[in-house]
Amino acid sequence: MPGRSSTSSGSTRYISFSGIESALSSLKNFQSCISSGMDTVSSVALDLVETQTEVSSEYSMDKAMVEFAKMDRELSHYVKAVQSTINHVKEERPEKVPDLKLLVEKKFLALQDKNSDADFKENEKFVQFKQQLRELKKQYGIHADRENDLTEGVDEDMIVTQSQTNFICPITQLEMKKPVKNKMCGHTYEEEAIVRMIESKHKRKKKACCPKIGCSHTDMRMSDLIPDEALRRAIESHNKKKKRHSE
């Protein structure tokens, strides 16, 4: 609870919110822990696909990611409720100090009541996890839950070969080593090449267009780029197999 001066007037002019703001800072730091947890789950899930390791539904990485996404949403709602309450009290400056805990709980519950599965579409980590998992499964010819697996009996190398065009950077025309994906249009590039291109354009006060032929995205920013872990793994796996076959 916020501390107060020795004055007994109860005026909000004497309320110190430093304690609450310090606690908020700690909560925001915990959000980074949740983010790290989601990165770990994503990495393990991709490992399982790459090694084609079966796990029971009890230990599903999808379920773990959903739980992290729920924690992230709940924590975000609580932080928002506290910040909203502090701002409201500072603006209204009521004569009598309100029950801050009660106000926060009301705002928090109001936010929680609006929860829906659609919220996960706004969680960047969750969306990235689903996309990368889907892409890696596609590279290996694995369908979700192995249902309606029309690729059974099809040579895995052929499936990967069909996707090899995705391995080439549209800028360097070479196979990518550190592919990054454009969140806005979905195209991928070699990280060093696209970063250099964007920086060069921005230094000349020009907009950077997606170098993929036919793409309509004409204002690329560094913040649009995310590591394409699924594609990186697929490229590495393909190269390992190619090396084994040549030996």
UniProtKB/Swiss-Prot annotation:
It comes from Mus musculus (Mouse). The modification N-acetylmethionine is found at residue 1. E3 SUMO-protein ligase component of the SMC5-SMC6 complex, a complex involved in DNA double-strand break repair by homologous recombination. Is not be required for the stability of the complex. The complex may promote sister chromatid homologous recombination by recruiting the SMC1-SMC3 cohesin complex to double-strand breaks. Acts as an E3 ligase mediating SUMO attachment to various proteins such as SMC6L1 and TSNAX, the shelterin complex subunits TERF1, TERF2, TINF2 and TERF2IP, RAD51AP1, and maybe the cohesin components RAD21 and STAG2. Belongs to the NSE2 family. PROSITE patterns: ZF_SP_RING (PS51044). This is E3 SUMO-protein ligase NSE2. The keyword Isomerase does not apply. Sumoylated, possibly via autosumoylation. The gene is Nsmce2. Keywords: Acetylation, Cell cycle, Cell division, Chromosome, DNA damage, DNA recombination, DNA repair, Isopeptide bond, Metal-binding, Mitosis, Nucleus, Phosphoprotein, Telomere, Transferase, Ubl conjugation, Ubl conjugation pathway, Zinc, Zinc-finger. It is found in: Nucleus; Chromosome, Telomere; Nucleus, PML body. CDD domains: SPL-RING_NSE2. Zn(2+) binds at residues 185, 187, 210, 215. Its EC number is 2.3.2.-.
